[in-house]
Each structure stands twice: as C-alpha cells, then as structure tokens.
C-alpha cells in the first residue's frame, strides 16, 4: 500500500473523528448560547458547568431502543441516516482546513484531496444529502414525516439553485473552482478578501446555506409546532443522532467554506497565524448560526419560496451580469 493511500486513510479517520466530536460538543455550545439569549443557565448539572452533558446525551442515544415503525420500509428507513452522514463527511474532502505544515520532516496537506473543482464538488456532494430527509419521510409510514419530506424537496432544491448561481460571480473573479486557489487569491491581505469584492454574493450564499442546513428561520423540515419532528418523527436512538450529527458536520463544513471563499481562509490575519485565523472565522460563523436561531422567528413555506424565487434568484443573476461587465471593463 502506497504512502499516499495510507496518508489519505489517516486523514479520513482524523476528519471523521474530529468532526464527530465537534458535532457532539456543538450541541452543548448551542444549548448554552440559546440559554444566554433567553436568560437561562442551560446545561449545568452533569459535570462542571454541564460539560459532561454531551457524554450523557451520547450514552442515552447509544443505549436507546432502535424502533422501526410497523409498515415502514426497513431498508430505506435505515439507509436515510447513513446517506446524511456520508454526504456530510464526503463533502469535506476538498476543504483545506489549515495551511500546509511539516511533521517529522514530512509535509502534511490538511485536506483529503485538492481537486480542481473543489467548490463544485462540495456543493454537489453536500446537496446529495437532500435524499436523506426525502427517503426518511417516505419510508417512515407517517403523515408528519411525509410532510417534512415534501418540504425538504421544495426547500433544498430551491435553495440549491440559488447557492449555485450565487457562487458563480466570485468564481468569475478568481477564475478557479479549487478552494485552495480561491484561498491563495486572497493572500495579498485584508483588502483582497472576496467579501469586499462580492458583498452581495456573500449575503446570498450565507442565507442560502442556512436554508440548505435546515437552520432557523428555515427549519421547515422539522417544525415542532406544525409537523412534530418532520422527517425525524419516527426515528430514535442512534439513527436519530446520526441525522443531527450530519447537520452539525454540514454546519462546520459551510462555516469553513464561507471563511475560505469570502474571508481569506487560512492566510495570516495580521499577527494571527493562518491556522488560528481560520478557526476564529469558522467559529464565528458557527456562533452566528446559533445567534440567528435565537433571534429570528420561523418563516412560512410560502414566504420562503417567495424570498428564494422572487428576491434571491434575481439578485444572484443580477450579480453575475454586473460582475461580468466589470471584468470586461
């Protein structure tokens, strides 16, 4: 077995382990953040400052009975959370999380694969996760799950169009689909960040990413007041945990991608080293998603579609046209 294959396998294992652990810890952070905004304490009983709440929740999920409803399609019911997990982690393959570094005289590239269509690969594989809520809702033999599945189809497909069109303008400026090349394009300093050259693209992509991540205010797929838990209604135990671990993995992936594409990625930020800089940027966008959840109410499905097709899509197309004109001039 070649050294490249061994190195890639080790990277995959580290990536899955690290982001699985971060996904579990993010549940604690989010509960603490929401509690702060709502003037509560949040988790505080299990361990110091409630830090062991993550371990307690993990043990609970692993030991809960795995229930499959009568009349459900067992194979598809089991396959859906696996698709969610696989799409979340595979989409991370082209993301350069840190700058290259040397370990024991061997240069390490902290990404799985530097493919020349990395950004497109990230969006395409990540969007394959849409099949998870669709299949989960169809296989559950439950009307609330079915409604959540229908909402997933409408919402995720609609915003996939917007997010794809939105990234075209920044890619026209950079001239490459590689996330590594996009990062290097902004290496000149603070003013080279694409957020200053493409502010509209940043805002549109951020909103579209919240819709694709099923984050508030776009969490129509599992709106508790309307459809119980949506496509997850019949899930319990480990399968239920896999859905939400995939959701947090997607959140971390989008946070890193937004940091790389619009905010200089892992380039040094003044006196702050690049590796620490990208962690600060990605951490801010994870926190921002929690802040938005605590601040904004849910939107109705018709409001969501109106915003997508009547506002965001025309703005994305207008941004492409204006960017093309500026490049030609």
UniProtKB/Swiss-Prot annotation:
The domain of life is: Bacteria
GO annotation terms (biological process): aerobic respiration
Alphabetic keyword roster: Cell inner membrane, Cell membrane, Membrane, NAD, Quinone, Translocase, Transmembrane, Transmembrane helix, Ubiquinone
The residues that cross the membrane are 9-29, 42-62, 75-95, 117-137, 154-174, 188-208, 238-258, 269-291, 309-329
In Gene Ontology terms, what is one molecular function of this protein? oxidoreductase activity, acting on NAD(P)H, quinone or similar compound as acceptor
Q: What does this protein do?
A: NDH-1 shuttles electrons from NADH, via FMN and iron-sulfur (Fe-S) centers, to quinones in the respiratory chain. The immediate electron acceptor for the enzyme in this species is believed to be ubiquinone. Couples the redox reaction to proton translocation (for every two electrons transferred, four hydrogen ions are translocated across the cytoplasmic membrane), and thus conserves the redox energy in a proton gradient. This subunit may bind ubiquinone.
What is the protein's given name?
A: NADH-quinone oxidoreductase subunit H
Q: What is the organism field in this record?
A: Helicobacter pylori (strain ATCC 700392 / 26695) (Campylobacter pylori)
| Gene name of this polypeptide | nuoH
């Amino acid at each position: 077995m070649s050294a490249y294959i061994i190195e890639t396998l080790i990277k995959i294992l580290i990536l899955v382990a690290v982001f699985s652990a971060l996904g579990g810890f993010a549940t604690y952070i989010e509960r603490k953040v929401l509690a702060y905004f709502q003037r509560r304490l949040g988790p505080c009983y299990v361990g110091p400052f409630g830090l062991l709440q993550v371990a307690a929740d993990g043990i609970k999920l692993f030991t809960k009975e795995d229930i499959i409803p009568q009349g459900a399609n067992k194979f598809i019911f089991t396959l859906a959370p696996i698709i969610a997990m696989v799409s979340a982690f595979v989409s991370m393959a082209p993301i350069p999380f840190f700058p290259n570094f040397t370990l024991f005289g061997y240069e390490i590239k902290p990404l799985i694969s530097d493919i020349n269509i990395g950004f497109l690969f990230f969006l395409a594989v990540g969007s394959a996760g849409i099949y998870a809520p669709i299949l989960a809702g169809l296989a559950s033999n439950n009307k609330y799950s079915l409604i959540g599945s229908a909402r997933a189809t409408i919402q995720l497909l609609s915003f996939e169009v917007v997010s794809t069109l939105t990234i075209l303008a920044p890619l026209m400026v950079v001239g490459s689909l590689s996330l590594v090349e996009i990062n290097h394009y902004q290496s000149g300093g603070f003013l080279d960040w694409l957020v200053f050259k493409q502010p509209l693209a940043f805002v549109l992509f951020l909103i579209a990413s919240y819709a694709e991540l099923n984050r508030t205010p776009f969490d129509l797929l599992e709106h508790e007041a309307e459809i119980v838990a949506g496509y997850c209604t019949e899930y319990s135990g480990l399968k239920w945990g896999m859905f939400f671990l995939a959701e947090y993995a997607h959140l971390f992936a989008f946070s890193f991608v937004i940091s790389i594409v619009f905010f200089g990625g892992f380039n040094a930020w003044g006196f702050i080293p690049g590796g620490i800089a990208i962690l600060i940027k990605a951490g801010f966008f994870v926190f921002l998603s929690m802040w938005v959840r605590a601040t904004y109410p849910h939107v109705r499905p018709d409001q969501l579609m109106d915003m997508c097709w009547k506002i965001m899509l025309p703005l994305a197309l207008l941004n492409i046209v204006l960017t093309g004109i500026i490049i030609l001039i």
